[in-house]
């Protein structure tokens, strides 16, 4: 007969530990326990039976793995936290007694813990660290935009700003930026580092206020970990690229609001390669070179071959050449020079032939980062800060990024000539060119014009709306209209007819969705008669469906009958979401092409 198990000594009661018992076991405060869990990556678990895990109690509580708590008990950071607690008691006692010399001595020798070992434990390889850098970048860029308060010291903000600038400098140098999206929360960037996609969010440059209900202590603990992680990653990236880390900062440029231009990237100066010489080793007072070692090895092999009759005699000519052969050093696979010599794609140097100038109302840090990441040259007015490579009157400027309405004003002949030689575009043109991977036409993005929809480039699921592959064709947006105004109107009618047909095909089964398609067609400028004719035509086609469609529907119904209730609900949910996506794609196509056709008509009228 097996031994009886005592209640609460095995199973879930042994594998899980409540938060209260974990704090008692570690002998630390709740704040220190939270900090340890954040730094070590330990989070609450949900047992199958909360009552069994809590030894029969049904009180609400948080559970942790017992092995995780035992893992925390040997953490060096926990030891430093205990030392800091004792240090705080001694310091308060010395200040209370007025012992200023001892208090100063305690302050100079206060315990400080490091997180290097935690980074190595949580991220064994460099690729693991790069995969988990998204949250670190978002947190660092967030704190870099916050004002300093009593809870946020200036040193912390300066360190976050420095890390953010170093990351942007590396992205610009390596030309790793791939996608950009302007949202309400901020600017989403996506880069490709070591074949890993990294996405982060940068808030707009507005005055930020920390809400009172936000626990800053928890965020500061995360920031402490993320700063160390980002420092490790940047050091590795800069070293592999052959750059000095940290990049030197020019204090004068920084004081004059030069931004990331205050940092200078410097290549690592490698010593000149000396001619290869045979390494000499002293043995019993006599120098032995590598040639002597090779000769000794050959003699040993020759002696073995004489004793073994099965081994064939080697050619003496080849033997002499092998003895005289010198060691040839091979290039390392992680040579920093090889990384910069890799061929770059055309999209990474998208703006290299162009020179941009920022108007005063456009955000300089955002668009300077975008343009320089794709090889372009950019300048700005003196009100943005120092460091502009050229002035507004420079004749090499090809594009002016402007975000103000078009207002008529008197211009001198020289100003008019300068304006005609440049192209004035709105900021969205830069972002859409980056996401499409090519230079788009400047016409729809001209100054004062209604912009086309700015869609997220992160919708990569199958069936997502692609503006370049709409009913107008992949190159329909890029083609210039060289015909007269009447030909443009005829083409618009044909395109609108195709749009209506694409929309109606997706929604003819539901009257509510059909009404939505009718409103969308009306907004696109299609009359009701044309829309009604398309609906009737499609209904007739559906009535003349072949019998095979009915057979397929019957097979689907039979398969559905064999499903369980859970599988049926999942199948219906999947079909509903698929149909909803098709409707959204059709509506997006109608609205976008209506805007594009109106902008093309406006260009021809002009």
UniProtKB/Swiss-Prot annotation:
Spell out the Acidic residues composition-biased ranges. 479-496
Q: Which GO terms describe its biological process?
A: maturation of 5.8S rRNA from tricistronic rRNA transcript (SSU-rRNA, 5.8S rRNA, LSU-rRNA); maturation of LSU-rRNA from tricistronic rRNA transcript (SSU-rRNA, 5.8S rRNA, LSU-rRNA)
Q: By its UniProt entry, which InterPro entries does this protein fall under?
A: BRCT_dom, BRCT_dom_sf, PES
Signal sequence, start to end = none
Q: Which GO terms describe its cellular component?
A: nucleoplasm; PeBoW complex; preribosome, large subunit precursor
Keywords noted in UniProt: Nucleus, Ribosome biogenesis, rRNA processing
Instruction: State a single Pfam family of this protein.
Output: Pescadillo_N
User: What are the GO MF terms of this UniProt record?
Assistant: ribonucleoprotein complex binding; RNA binding
This protein's record includes keyword rRNA processing = yes
Q: Where is this region: Disordered?
A: 461-497
What are the residue boundaries of the BRCT domain, all occurrences included? 346-447
Gene3D superfamilies xrefs: BRCT domain (3.40.50.10190)
* Top-level taxon of the source organism: Eukaryota
Look up keyword Nucleus and say if it applies.
yes
Q: Which family does it belong to?
A: Belongs to the pescadillo family.
Q: Which PANTHER family does the UniProt entry name for this protein?
A: PESCADILLO - RELATED, PESCADILLO HOMOLOG
Whom does it interact with, and what assembly results?
Component of the NOP7 complex, composed of ERB1, NOP7 and YTM1. The complex is held together by ERB1, which interacts with NOP7 via its N-terminal domain and with YTM1 via a high-affinity interaction between the seven-bladed beta-propeller domains of the 2 proteins. The NOP7 complex associates with the 66S pre-ribosome.
What does the protein in this record do?
Component of the NOP7 complex, which is required for maturation of the 25S and 5.8S ribosomal RNAs and formation of the 60S ribosome.
Name by which UniProt lists this protein: Pescadillo homolog
Name the source organism.
Laccaria bicolor (strain S238N-H82 / ATCC MYA-4686) (Bicoloured deceiver)
């Amino acid at each position: 007969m097996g031994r009886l198990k005592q209640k609460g000594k095995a199973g879930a009661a042994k594998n899980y530990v409540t938060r209260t018992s974990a704090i008692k076991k570690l002998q630390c405060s709740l704040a220190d326990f939270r900090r340890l869990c954040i730094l070590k990556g330990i989070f609450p678990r949900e047992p199958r039976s909360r009552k069994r895990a809590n030894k029969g109690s049904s009180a609400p509580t948080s559970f942790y793995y017992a092995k995780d708590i035992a893992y925390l008990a040997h953490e060096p950071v926990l030891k430093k936290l205990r030392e800091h607690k004792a240090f705080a008691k001694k310091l308060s006692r010395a200040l209370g007694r007025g012992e200023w010399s001892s208090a100063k001595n305690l302050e100079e020798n206060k315990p400080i813990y490091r997180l290097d070992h935690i980074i190595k434990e949580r991220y064994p390889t460099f690729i693991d660290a790069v995969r988990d850098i998204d949250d670190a970048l978002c947190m660092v860029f967030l704190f870099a935009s916050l004002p300093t308060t009593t809870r946020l010291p200036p040193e912390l903000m300066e360190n976050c700003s420095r890390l953010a600038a170093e990351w942007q400098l590396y992205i610009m140098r390596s030309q790793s930026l791939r996608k950009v999206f302007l949202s309400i929360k901020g600017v989403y960037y996506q880069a490709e580092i070591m074949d890993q996609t990294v996405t982060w969010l940068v808030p707009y440059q507005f005055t930020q206020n920390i809400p009172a209900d936000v626990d800053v202590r928890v965020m500061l603990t995360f920031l402490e970990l993320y700063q160390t992680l980002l420092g490790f990653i940047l050091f590795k990236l800069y070293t592999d690229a052959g750059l000095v880390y940290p990049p030197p900062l020019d204090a004068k440029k920084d004081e004059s609001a030069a931004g990331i231009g205050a940092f200078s990237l410097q290549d690592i100066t490698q010593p000149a390669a000396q001619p290869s010489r045979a390494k000499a080793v002293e043995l019993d007072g006599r120098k032995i070179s590598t040639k002597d070692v090779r000769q000794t090895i050959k003699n040993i092999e020759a002696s073995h071959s004489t004793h073994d009759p099965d081994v064939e005699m080697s050619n003496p000519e080849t033997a002499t050449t092998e003895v005289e052969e010198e060691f040839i050093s091979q290039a390392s696979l992680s040579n920093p020079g090889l990384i910069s010599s890799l061929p770059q794609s055309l999209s990474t140097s998208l703006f290299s032939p162009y020179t941009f100038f920022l108007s005063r109302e456009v955000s300089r840090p955002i668009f300077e980062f975008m343009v320089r990441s794709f090889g372009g040259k950019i300048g700005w007015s003196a009100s943005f800060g120092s460091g502009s490579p050229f002035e507004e009157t420079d004749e090499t400027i090809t594009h002016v990024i402007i975000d103000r309405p078009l207002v008529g004003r008197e211009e001198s002949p020289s100003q008019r000539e300068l304006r005609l030689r440049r192209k004035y575009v709105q900021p969205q043109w830069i972002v859409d060119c980056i996401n499409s991977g090519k230079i788009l036409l400047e016409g729809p993005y001209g100054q004062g014009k209604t912009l086309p929809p700015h869609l997220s480039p992160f919708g990569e699921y199958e069936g997502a709306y692609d503006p370049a592959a709409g009913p107008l064709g992949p190159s329909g947006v890029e083609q210039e209209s060289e015909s007269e105004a009447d030909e443009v109107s005829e083409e618009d009618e044909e395109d609108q007819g195709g749009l209506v047909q694409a929309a109606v095909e997706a929604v003819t089964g539901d009257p509510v969705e059909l009404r939505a398609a009718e409103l969308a067609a009306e907004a696109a400028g299609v009359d009701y008669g044309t829309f009604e004719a398309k609906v009737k035509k499609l209904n007739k086609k559906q009535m003349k469906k072949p019998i095979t469609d009915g057979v397929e529907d019957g097979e689907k119904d039979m398969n559905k009958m064999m499903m369980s209730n859970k599988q049926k609900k999942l199948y219906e949910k999947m079909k509903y979401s698929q149909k909803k996506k098709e409707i959204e794609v059709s509506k997006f196509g109608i609205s976008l092409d209506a805007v594009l056709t109106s902008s093309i008509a406006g260009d021809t009228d002009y």
